[in-house]
Curated annotation (Swiss-Prot):
Keyword Protein biosynthesis among record annotations: yes
Cysteine-cysteine disulfides: none
GO molecular function terms attached to this record: translation elongation factor activity
Domain of life: Bacteria
Protein's job: Involved in peptide bond synthesis. Stimulates efficient translation and peptide-bond synthesis on native or reconstituted 70S ribosomes in vitro. Probably functions indirectly by altering the affinity of the ribosome for aminoacyl-tRNA, thus increasing their reactivity as acceptors for peptidyl transferase.
InterPro entries hit by this protein: Elong-fact-P_C, NA-bd_OB-fold, Rib_uL2_dom2, Transl_elong_fac_P/YeiP, Transl_elong_KOW-like, Transl_elong_P/YeiP_cen, Transl_elong_P/YeiP_CS, Transl_elongation_fac_P
Protein name according to UniProt: Elongation factor P
Chief location category: cytoplasm
GO CC annotation terms, alphabetical: cytoplasm
Coiled-coil zones: none
Record-level GO BP terms: peptide biosynthetic process
CDD domains on file: S1_EF-P_repeat_1 (cd04470), S1_EF-P_repeat_2 (cd05794)
UniProt organism field: Chlorobaculum tepidum (strain ATCC 49652 / DSM 12025 / NBRC 103806 / TLS)
Compartments reported by the entry: Cytoplasm
Length: 188
């Protein structure tokens, strides 16, 4: 058990019987009241975000984790099959461990898998940016290229992303996997 004051952003704690990742932790001392820590956490079992106010003296259980590089191979029903690049062992990862970024996962992408001290999978971290090909989008007319609007486009993984008007079918684009937003066109 560790004091909440010694926990930082990115740490994984066991709270209410489930593993939670600390997204943000802010120390507050309001007026005549006692100090507290306002935590924004992500439940790693359900994927839901949770807000909680810890007292400044509260103790939490920090989970010892291990990160390993894996390569995404294919999807098997609800699970994603990943391969350890050193031992070539394959494991099935549930979609909830990857989260909404799973829609940008394409074959052979390297990911970091975070394991708990008991060997269970806590979360899967995709690269911050991925480069995907646009497979379907409406054609741009001459008038559209002069405006700064966006249009929907389907990328090779099947995900829909809003892109600028000048992007055409066949273009390679860079996408931020954290927000799902278009970043730039890749010139190859």
């Amino acid at each position: 058990m560790v004091s909440i004051s010694n926990v930082s952003r990115g740490a994984i704690i066991r709270w209410n019987g489930a593993p939670h990742s600390i997204e943000s932790l802010v120390h507050r001392t309001p007026g005549n009241l006692r100090a507290f820590y306002q935590a924004s956490m992500k439940n790693l079992k359900t994927g839901r975000n949770v807000e909680y106010r810890f007292s400044a003296t509260e103790q939490v259980d920090v989970i010892v984790t291990e990160r390993k590089k894996y390569q995404y191979l294919y999807r098997d029903g609800e699970d994603y099959v990943m391969m350890d690049t050193e031992t070539f062992d394959q494991i099935n990862v549930p979609e909830v461990a990857i989260g909404p970024a799973s829609r940008f996962l394409k074959d052979s992408v390297m990911v970091d898998i975070v394991f708990a001290d008991d060997g269970s999978i806590l979360e899967v971290e995709l690269p911050t940016f991925v480069e995907l090909e646009v497979t379907e989008t409406s054609p741009a007319s001459k008038d559209d290229r002069a405006t700064s609007g966006t249009k929907p486009a389907i990328v090779e993984t099947g995900a829909e992303v809003n892109v600028p008007m000048f992007i055409q079918t066949g273009s390679i684009i860079r996408i931020d996997t954290r927000s799902g937003e278009y970043m730039e066109r890749v010139k190859k």
